[in-house]
């Protein structure tokens, strides 16, 4: 999602690798308007290009979306296809955005933010079927409570599981099992 003037060269380099080896997904790809909006057009073009590669290879995409839900959804709707699916990485949107993402064939990647006091997604996530959720760490960022502000690590995923267990009124083992099945399915493992 970091795009500069030489983004076409960078894309060509990525394409070389995609054609050389087998991968389980294409990503993180997407649009990030948090720091800088000046390269929006280039980000949109790069996103579309990488979506095309994913559709050709029948691979899921992992979407990076920061301050860009409208722009991402516009592209996903125009590229809609049974071969376009994947995960909204580190999902932090609204309930309506969650439903829209799922309607477009995507799962929601849920990590440490669900444990934050003002993260927001804990207010509605249990209205989203667990079959639409995969777990993530976003390591080294976005550590769950009680480690917020510290370097994230994979072992902290248990705190995300614990929070989801409370929100869904299911055992931690059940949350872990169901979300693992979702990940295995989406990445064809």
Annotate each PLM feature:
Residues 1-189:
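Mid-domain alpha/beta scaffold segments of enzyme catalytic cores
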């Amino acid at each position: 999602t970091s795009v500069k003037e030489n983004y076409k060269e960078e894309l060509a380099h990525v394409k070389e690798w995609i054609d050389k080896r087998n991968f389980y997904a294409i990503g993180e790809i997407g649009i990030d308007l948090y720091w800088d909006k000046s390269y929006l057009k280039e980000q949109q073009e790069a996103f579309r290009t990488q979506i095309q590669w994913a559709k050709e290879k029948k691979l899921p995409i992992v979407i990076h979306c920061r301050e860009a839900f409208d722009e991402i959804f516009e592209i996903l709707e125009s590229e809609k296809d049974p071969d376009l699916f994947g995960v909204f990485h580190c999902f932090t949107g609204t309930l309506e955005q969650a439903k829209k993402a799922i309607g477009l064939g995507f799962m929601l990647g849920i990590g440490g933010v669900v444990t934050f006091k003002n993260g927001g997604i804990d207010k509605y996530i249990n209205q989203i079927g667990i079959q639409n959720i995969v777990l993530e760490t976003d390591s080294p960022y976005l550590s769950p409570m009680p480690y917020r502000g510290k370097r994230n690590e994979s072992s902290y995923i248990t705190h995300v599981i614990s929070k989801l267990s409370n929100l869904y009124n299911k055992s931690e083992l059940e949350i872990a099992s169901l979300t693992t099945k979702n990940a295995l399915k989406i990445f064809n493992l």
